[in-house]
Amino acid sequence: DSSNLPPNQKQIVD
């Protein structure tokens, strides 16, 4: 997934 994105962006992946 978007592992290169910051934590705040990874939350959207959920």
Curated annotation (Swiss-Prot):
Keywords: Disulfide bond, Secreted, Toxin. One of its GO terms (molecular function) is toxin activity. Contains 8 disulfide bonds. It comes from the Eukaryota. It is found in: Secreted. One of its GO terms (biological process) is defense response. Expressed by the venom gland. Not toxic when administered to crickets at doses up to 5 nmol/g. This is Cysteine-rich venom protein 23. It comes from Naja haje haje (Egyptian cobra).
